[in-house]
């Protein structure tokens, strides 16, 4: 399985290590960037780590691998040894999503009585900044992170593209600043449900606020040709029945939409048919957040 991503993408992991690709299942982890860049992908047609991509390709849906091949044709012209940096800058977040955990959200950590904060800002400084042409690091929630704002104010000189993955809870003023600097900006809005399904999965972010944020980005897109928008859905047992509504909303917004299949927590995998386990999970999560399910 050919994929340029593992040689040109470095992920900042939640445990302070470096990873490759950022979309793998059970990916290798490395303590330094040199080891990460020396790792080689299996020659198998279907490496086990790449299951999320080849499962989508099997049903003729676009995969991260295919997108990476298209991107490689462009980015390799900018710099042959280009590097895309992704992963987790920190865990500062204003949302306690049902599919998330305390390691990626300070909101969840606080609900659990945990003071844990994951911060990879210094780890980012270890990277070869002269090779970085695209920044794809997230959180947490970028609009909620002082680290992320500082990073955007001090971008490495060769960065031409910034992708921001946001929960859509608020409009990010930094986007227009980047656009004015002629940097290509891709805003990926997580779209894990519409209406009450959104409000349950993305608690405490409200659907009414999310749609207002989307409208602001659509308006901004009319002003800047270097702004691209897309939706990303993490498909799981909580939003599977809502998927048609999700697709209809994306189509109405004229925003490209992609999705991936959730693997963790396993109880939310759409291939998991254990209803009792799902019910227990949902009850536990509702109790933690003090909410009820109103589908």
Q: What kind of feature is each model-predicted range?
A:
Residues 237-253:
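Catalytic cores of alpha/beta
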Residues 81-92, 103-119, 130-145, 157-172, ...:
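Core AdoMet radical
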Residues 177-184, 218-222, 251:
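Acidic (Asp/Glu)-rich catalytic clusters
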Residues 152, 175-176, 211-218, 243-248:
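Generic structural signal for well-ordered alpha-helices
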Residues 1-69, 263-295:
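Accessory C-terminal segments flanking Radical SAM cores
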Residues 49, 57, 92-96, 101-104:
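Short pre-active-site segment immediately N-terminal to redox-active cysteine/selenocysteine motifs
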